[in-house]
């Protein structure tokens, strides 16, 4: 959530940053500023009325103490004025409460501000390529799409999964299930060795958690909700792991806090009709290892780069060709102030596809979730910065392996680093 004080003091600058996100200028600060002025006017009036009410209470006490008859005209007039003030105050209170509620609702609809260093752009076409890695590992043969080789190997069940659930669900069997499990364990082991503390969080989460990380209220239609409880299926482990610290104050000496977590993830994929209808790229349920950091604002940028490196390390260990993109303002995620996407090479389509999105959210999520830090010897608290990224999306990693490691005889070589997990060299 954005800082209302910052909006109030620098409305033109904040509006300009929001406009960088949207060519249609869909984010208008005017309704917030109007309500903020009304609320502050009411607050000022209420303060004056309360001061006068307190003054009258003291006057009545002083006069009665001095021996003036409580039924005297003077005291009765003061009591009448005091009652009138209480009536006015009682009428102002719900007005102010309503305005505060409306301001908060409007603030929750606003995305994070792009950093000054985020490239300007309108869409993904304007994202900036930072680097490529692994050209020497590009396949030398023509390969089949990952879903076709998986079905030929008998490791992927689509029709039976659809029978159980609906479209965009799959079942992995035999070596496919083993490869998925091996990838999860390998990814977790790598990140634990990099200093992340593993968490197994709930995957059913409440609305406060989704609001804290920015999925609610704006993106409710993209998540699955339980019909009888205030519980949602987690779209990413970023949500429950970040919310472990909701409404808490951490000591500065504890930072950075670094967690990795494997969870199944659930997304309705609203608006993706007709896209990636086959294979492992776009599913309603998929597995992912997530990286989450809570960091000091002063180290935020360096910690972000480190998180990107941690995600890249998985692709490098697997020897999968990829590229790193810095997202432009028009393609930036709702909660991010700066973001790098890792895209892995899928040779069957001749394209790079996103496999990790590494975001620096600044204090945006921390303000929504009320996660603060306290420094020794300093008064007050400040909001932490939160970072998150996939380390990695497991299904998409499997898709990349099935394509990049295909052999001319129709088998798939197991990457060297996964062979100790799978106890085999060939699928």
From Swiss-Prot:
InterPro entries named among the record's database cross-references: aa-tRNA-synt_IIb, aa-tRNA-synth_II, aa-tRNA-synth_II/BPL/LPL, Ser-tRNA-ligase_type_1, Ser-tRNA-synth_1_N, SerRS_1_N_sf, SerRS_core, tRNA-bd_arm
Residues the record lists as binding ATP: 267-269, 354-357
Catalytic reaction(s) noted: tRNA(Ser) + L-serine + ATP = L-seryl-tRNA(Ser) + AMP + diphosphate + H(+); tRNA(Sec) + L-serine + ATP = L-seryl-tRNA(Sec) + AMP + diphosphate + H(+)
Biological pathway: Aminoacyl-tRNA biosynthesis; selenocysteinyl-tRNA(Sec) biosynthesis; L-seryl-tRNA(Sec) from L-serine and tRNA(Sec): step 1/1
Gene3D superfamilies: Bira Bifunctional Protein, Domain 2, Serine-tRNA synthetase, tRNA binding domain
GO MF term (any one): ATP binding
Enzyme class: ligase
GO biological process, one term: seryl-tRNA aminoacylation
Subcellular location field: Cytoplasm
Pfam families: Seryl_tRNA_N (PF02403), tRNA-synt_2b (PF00587)
EC annotation from Swiss-Prot or TrEMBL: 6.1.1.11
GO cellular component, one term: cytoplasm
This protein's UniProt keywords: Aminoacyl-tRNA synthetase, ATP-binding, Cytoplasm, Ligase, Nucleotide-binding, Protein biosynthesis
Residues given in the record as L-serine binding sites: 236-238, 290, 390
Function of the molecule: Catalyzes the attachment of serine to tRNA(Ser). Is also able to aminoacylate tRNA(Sec) with serine, to form the misacylated tRNA L-seryl-tRNA(Sec), which will be further converted into selenocysteinyl-tRNA(Sec).
PANTHER family per UniProt: SERINE--TRNA LIGASE, SERYL-TRNA SYNTHETASE
Domains (record comment): Consists of two distinct domains, a catalytic core and a N-terminal extension that is involved in tRNA binding.
Subunit structure: Homodimer. The tRNA molecule binds across the dimer.
Similarity field: Belongs to the class-II aminoacyl-tRNA synthetase family. Type-1 seryl-tRNA synthetase subfamily.
Protein name according to UniProt: Serine--tRNA ligase
Lineage: Bacteria, Bacillati, Cyanobacteriota, Cyanophyceae, Oscillatoriophycideae
Gene that produces this protein: serS
């Amino acid at each position: 959530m954005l800082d209302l004080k910052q909006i109030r003091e620098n409305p033109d600058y904040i509006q300009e940053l929001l406009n960088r996100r949207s060519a249609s200028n869909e984010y208008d600060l005017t309704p917030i500023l109007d309500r903020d002025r009304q609320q502050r006017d009411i607050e000022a009036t209420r303060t004056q009325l309360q001061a006068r009410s307190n003054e009258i209470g003291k006057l009545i006490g002083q006069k009665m103490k001095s021996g003036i008859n409580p039924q005297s005209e003077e005291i009765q007039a003061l009591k009448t004025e005091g009652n009138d003030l209480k009536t006015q105050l009682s009428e102002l209170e719900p007005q102010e409460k309503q305005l505060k509620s409306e301001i908060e609702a409007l603030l929750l609809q606003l995305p994070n501000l792009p950093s000054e260093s985020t490239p300007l752009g309108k869409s993904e076409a304007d994202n900036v390529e930072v680097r490529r890695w692994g050209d020497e590992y590009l396949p030398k043969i023509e390969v089949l799409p990952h879903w076709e080789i998986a079905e030929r190997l008998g490791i992927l069940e689509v029709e039976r999964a659809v029978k159980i659930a609906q479209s965009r669900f799959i079942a992995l069997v035999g070596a496919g299930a083993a490869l998925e499990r091996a990838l999860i364990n390998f990814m977790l082991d790598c990140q634990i060795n990099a200093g992340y503390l593993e968490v197994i969080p709930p995957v059913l989460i409440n609305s406060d958690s989704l609001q804290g990380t920015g999925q609610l209220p704006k993106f409710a239609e993209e998540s699955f909700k339980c019909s009888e409880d205030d519980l949602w299926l987690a779209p990413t482990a970023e949500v429950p792991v970040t919310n472990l610290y909701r409404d808490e104050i951490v000591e500065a000496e504890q930072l950075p806090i670094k967690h990795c977590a494997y969870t199944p993830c659930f997304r309705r994929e609203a608006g993706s009709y007709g896209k990636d209808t086959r294979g492992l790229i776009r599913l309603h349920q998929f597995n992912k290892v997530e990286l989450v950091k809570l960091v000091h604002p002063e180290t935020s940028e360096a910690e972000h780069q480190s998180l990107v490196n941690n995600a890249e390390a998985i692709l490098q260990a697997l020897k999968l060709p990829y590229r790193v993109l810095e997202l432009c303002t028009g393609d930036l995620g709702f909660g991010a102030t700066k973001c790098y996407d890792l895209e892995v090479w899928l040779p069957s389509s001749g394209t790079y596809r996103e496999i990790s999105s590494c975001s620096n959210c600044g204090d945006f999520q921390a303000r929504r979730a009320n996660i603060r830090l306290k420094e020794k010897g300093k008064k007050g608290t400040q909001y932490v910065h939160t970072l998150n990224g996939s380390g990695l999306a497991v299904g998409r990693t499997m898709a990349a392996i099935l394509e990049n490691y295909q052999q001319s005889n129709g088998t798939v070589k197991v990457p060297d680093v996964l062979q100790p997990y799978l106890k085999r060299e060939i699928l």
